[in-house]
Amino acid sequence: MKNEAATELMMHLQQLDPEISRILWANFDHRNPSPLSKAIQDARGISRQAASQILSRLVRQGLITEGAGVRPKTYEQQTLFTHSVTLPLDGLEEHVVWSEHFRPAFSQYMGEAALSIWEYGFTEILNNAREHSQGTEVKISSNIRAGCTSVWMDDNGEGIFKRISRICKLPDERQAILELAKGKLTTDPENHSGEGVFFSARAFDMFQITSGGLLFDHQDGEEDFLFERDKEKAGTLVWMAHGNHTQRTLKEVFDEYSMPDEYTFSKTVVPVKLARFGQEGLVSRSQAQRLLARVDRFKIVLFDFSDVETVGQAFADEIFRVYAKGHPEVELQPIHATPQIQQMITRATAMT
């Protein structure tokens, strides 16, 4: 009976309209039940009654369950598939783990674009744990719902931020997150390009790295965030989540950071706020130099000033006059700058 129920559930999921799957993911709250009727009405241009009929059918099929909310009515996505495995890192082959333990189920629950992103990101992050963590084992867990899939990879190694700080001789583990956000960072330049974590973070809808007392959070279309945690996390935990019927392709992710007619990683976005440690303001040349480390590896660098209200004159001058003059081959562009910040940049460039 259990196998029959699983087969029936699989059939319902395979027949699920991709648009409904995307609505479930876009309106899904990992912690609380979510109202869905209005989202379906707006997406489909249908009445509340018609949206309720769709939701009632999804409940009967076992794809979602009703939450406690009444006005508006709320729903939760059912977990349809889970799998967890703990493996030794020594001798591990990431493509074998993917193809034997996870791809068979993933391929039944999602579209080709999502599957391609999972194959890339899963194997890149697992390879990173195998070759760089200095750990002995990794635990991999997956959770598939009607709208989305999540994977956790938890190794018992040194910790990614601690390792980067040690090998790259950085003064603070928080700067390791800033360097990861730029891309082209590797602790083994002879064998790795430093692109795997960067592109994995941008391929998935949601991506988090937790290690030590820090958490790095990247969400598609949102700003990068750095959270400081009270509780230390040994090793490195990477969480990835992605819509089962995403319309974004892996090629589009790569193209966003490449020059036209080129196939190289030549463009990056630097979240300026990650150069700010604690409550400090961004006023000094040394803080600007945190941002500028290694940006000469790119042709175009976008400095994203989201969540930064103001900067000091020395900070702006170091980036947009001093560095720009010394590196004319690198195009520096500010984005999301406030009028005050733009004024500081204009003042700096006027002095060149």
Which residues does each predicted region cover?
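A short acidic (Asp/Glu
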Residues: 220, 312-317, 343-345
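A short acidic, amphipathic alpha-helical/loop segment
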Residues: 199, 290, 318-319
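Bergerat-fold GHKL ATPase/HATPase_c domain
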Residues: 2-123, 132-135, 146, 165, ...
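Short, non-transmembrane amphipathic alpha-helical segments
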Residues: 315-326
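A structural signal for short secondary-structure junctions
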Residues: 232-234, 294-297
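Short, glycine-/small-residue-enriched flexible loop/hinge segments at domain edges that mediate gating
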Residues: 298-311
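Conserved beta-strand-loop-beta-strand hairpin that lines the nucleotide-binding pocket
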Residues: 29, 65-85, 129-251, 322-324
